[in-house]
Amino acid sequence: KLAGINKKLVTVIRDPIDRILSDYNYSRTSYNKKGGASKAYRTKIYAAGNYSLEGYVSYLKENRPVYGRYISRFVLGPNKVDDPVKFLEQNYFSYGVLERMDLFVDDFHKKSGLSLIQQNANKTIARAVKEIPDSARKSITEFCEEDIHLYQSVRKAIEK
């Protein structure tokens, strides 16, 4: 059934704010596990290990060409797309959002006849930050504006 399909891509998009928080916690944990010399390099992991969540987001903003448009750059490409759902419809076989994997699994099954099994894995247990302070949320929202637009557009489209 998949042989005749021209679209080869599938994607599941995560809430950008949750993704930043998860990335911060994961990077912070990774930094704390590193040895002395490797802690000296000024990287994203260094920023997570030494700064608050808001400081970490400031570091990401300062290095926007590398860390900006984190989701949309991989899903939509190098240029801004005004209608991300239309782009996904034209270029992706199936798409969804992590928080509604049930809808993605159903859509993929309807289109392919293949059943996917949902699994929860890869969770950072030792989270330094569980709740996002309002000031950090504002900073993340500004930094992830395009990713948030993509996520909200996709979520709205799949929940119709």
Identify the role of each PLM range.
Residues 1-13, 17-118:
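PAPS-dependent sulfotransferase catalytic domain
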Residues 100, 116-160:
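PAPS-dependent sulfotransferase catalytic core
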